[in-house]
Amino acid sequence: MTVVCDEGRIEWVGSAGLAPRADHELEVDGFLMPGAADRHVHIGLADPGAVLLGGVTAVRDLAWPPDVIFPLADASELPTFNGPLIRAAGPMITAPGGYPTAERWAPPGTGLEVRGAEEAATAVEVLAGRGAAAIKVSLNAEAGPTPTDGELAAIVQAAGERGLPVTAHVQGVGQAERALGAGVSEFAHCPWSERLSESVLEAAAKAVRIVSTLDIWSFGNVTSELRTATDNMARFRAAGGTVVYGTDLGNGAIPPGIDVREVLLLRETVGMTADEILEALVAGPLESGGPADLIAPARDPREDLTALGDLKLVIRAGRVVTAA
């Protein structure tokens, strides 16, 4: 396969014999594919350069102080930026004293406390004006108070009016049901704190997608949280639900770049095929007009998923980051 890139975009994809002339050529002995996208990171707790070298060319940050993360997201658009493209939610909307305001990992401003439906809607308006790519809401009843049903409804409505998805951190009995009832778009983690009923998972499969984040509960070990999350995810998928790749990078011992442990958990404990995992992993199809964000594992990952940890090439916005 030959891919021709120009000014950060893919210009042409096809066989070598039909390719248009290019100013520079690079031959790579590997499997050429789109770069990976991690839909749940805290990039302020990670090294963006290492994330990119590991094959993740786009990330979505799901909770960080707005005065830090939005300028960083803007900077990631520049050709000189050493890291992945960053899209950001900004701070997580929460109740006064709610998660993550007391967490050690979260600097001041990571949680945005709201009081009442009007304040909740205004928070969404402000974040949208600053360039938020999504709105994250905290429904962690195990760590503290959560937004009221009225506040949650106002958040979802205000986000919908601005074309923004709402992703929910659901933790604690009944929080998944609350999120679904309010009309959120996504669960930022697969629920791990309780085994969800078949009826809840069937409703979820029709309404939300789930960001995987399995390795954050295990780091290579088998835990009760991992067993609950994978059981919920397998049944969610059996009901027709969509899973996308995400790691919660920055929290715990998650490696920068593509987390092969996460990928293997999706296959071994959830039952996803290699093709399904790659579809969940990549930022988008390899096609003309798309971003020139490419990686080349040493082997075909459809046959050996561990090849995603052995990269021969990383290209970000048409710029060669590394080539072996």
Please place each PLM-identified region on the residue numbering:
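His/Asp/Glu-enriched, well-ordered alpha-helical/loop segment
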Residues: 228-301
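Divalent metal-coordination and catalytic microenvironments
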Residues: 3, 8, 29, 37-40, ...
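N-terminal metal-binding scaffold of metallo-dependent hydrolase/deaminase domains
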Residues: 1-21, 299-304, 319-320
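Active-site core of metal-dependent hydrolases
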Residues: 138-231, 239, 244-251, 270-272
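Glycine-rich beta-to-alpha transition loops that act as phosphate-gripper elements at the mouths
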Residues: 93, 117, 167-173, 298
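Divalent-metal coordination cores built from histidine and acidic residues
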Residues: 48-140, 144-164, 207-217
